Amino acid sequence: MAYYRTPHDVTALPAWQALQKHRDAMQSFSMREAFAADAKRFDQFSLSACGLFLDYSKNLITEQSRDLLVSLANEVGLQDAIKSMFSGEIINASEGRPVLHTALRRPVGDKLSVNGVNVMPEVHKVLNQITELVGRIHDGLWRGYSEKPITDVVNIGIGGSFLGPELVSEALLPYAQRGVRCHYLANIDGSEFHELSANLRAETTLFIVSSKSFNTLETLKNAMAARTWYLAQGGSEAELYRHFIAVSSNKAAAVAFGIREENIFPMWDWVGGRYSLWSAIGLPIALAIGTANFKELLSGAYTMDQHFQTAPFDKNMPVLLALLGVWYGNFWDANSHAILPYDHYLRNITKHLQQLDMESNGKSVLQDGTPVKTDTGPVIWGGVGCNGQHAYHQLLHQGTQLIPADFIVPVVSFNPVADHHQWLYANCLSQSQALMLGKTREEAEAELRAKGLNEADIEKLAPHKVIPGNRPSNTLVVERISPRRLGALVAMYEHKVFVQSVIWGINAFDQWGVELGKELGKGVYQRLVGSLEDSAEDGSTQGLINYFRGRHRG
């Protein structure tokens, strides 16, 4: 039986038990001493793949650690799980679906059957439709109701219909095509729509409504607000089709909204929202950077798919990162993981990875519904590196929690200013170095003596200047952010998340926890507006409803 039908008890596996013993033996392991003792440690714990360079030498591991972690991957049947995903088996068991976002980046000529049907012709048909539409808009052939070319495109979507496309279009801003500006509208908060629409003209604005079901509350409310605004600005119902297109699997609902069927791009149930930027959900990406660059993005992801499927686990970038995450989360009691990009254009990668990781692996039952016996997904947090140094890096250095971190940095800047980028790169490296080295009591005292402090003051101040060190991190270096390398980077994290789900025996591709809040939200709304008089299920919620109703105006 496949792993997703008969989930294992990972804690009973020999490799897991060996790792527990190894963890005890590693209690006094010092990275500082390991580097001093082994001049080749950097070479032994680093690798290149798909335009990315990974240094994972600043981790609490030895070669034995890596071997044991790889053994764990083998014992859970990771290779078979990878094959199952790429071949279209139903690995999303709770929803009865295959998981094939990887099909979206496979080249022309590949074959892949879902329910006996080769899906690749349809995938490339949609990609060709994207290419045609983007070309018409960039060439000024798609015109609004006043016959003026489109200048602004607003993507209306939330979750995976927003976070991935926003990340990519902003990360690749240096590749932006002239003439068309792309914007994103996700939050149901009216202030977001107000601020965005204030800078738009209806006659030259195109809205993309991105919702698989065409029933997502926030997206539909924003789409209706956009429609009302469009009509108030001088647009007409008859010309609505010029200003609204959709990405959805619910054609009937999109047509009822006023969108022409030929302007509805399909979605497939074998592509989850947080994995959908490679699909027609990526239409705003293609509009922002052009279809040639969008296809380069897909190609970069495809190269990582190939690496993931073929590289030995001890030289497999997504697998190694996943195993390190399991090592810290399950054996070192780490509850969170920091993502620290040292690049302005990558500032939104943490938000995307939060959804990718936490929505995928925030699970407490195995594939068969029985409780897990281990901790699963960590909290993902972080932000732009240099800014974080003056905010939360203090917790990384001297806090009581062990928090592994990923540093992401390019070698070349798109916008060099004097020696700014050299300082940026130096800051990135020095932060990972400081986490690893720390500062001993002796070093702190010597530093204070060199400044002329007396012994009494040194005795008081030195403990505050001690930094434990031995804090783990990975450093991911790219020569320069490009569509191809970014595609590989995002795909790498996708595969990392999948590997961890296989080890824990959970389903990374459903999100039932998200649904409960949606269901309860309907009842809360009805009570807020007075259409439902029954009390809420609990006193706290009812009290907050009463507070709102007693004070709300408008």
From Swiss-Prot:
GO terms, molecular function: carbohydrate derivative binding; glucose-6-phosphate isomerase activity; monosaccharide binding
According to its UniProt entry, the protein's GO biological process terms are: gluconeogenesis; glucose 6-phosphate metabolic process; glycolytic process
Give the matching InterPro entries.
G6P_Isomerase (IPR001672), G6P_Isomerase_C (IPR023096), Phosphoglucose_isomerase_CS (IPR018189), SIS_dom_sf (IPR046348), SIS_PGI_1 (IPR035476), SIS_PGI_2 (IPR035482)
Q: Name one Pfam family in it.
A: PGI
Give the EC class as a word: isomerase
In terms of one coarse class, where is the protein primarily found? cytoplasm
Q: Which reaction does it catalyse?
A: alpha-D-glucose 6-phosphate = beta-D-fructose 6-phosphate
Quote the EC number. 5.3.1.9
Catalytic site: 359, 390, 518
A cellular component term from Gene Ontology for this protein is: cytosol
Q: Where found in the cell?
A: Cytoplasm
Keywords recorded for this protein, A-Z: Cytoplasm, Gluconeogenesis, Glycolysis, Isomerase
Name the job this protein performs.
Answer: Catalyzes the reversible isomerization of glucose-6-phosphate to fructose-6-phosphate.
Protein name per UniProt: Glucose-6-phosphate isomerase
Tell me the gene name: pgi
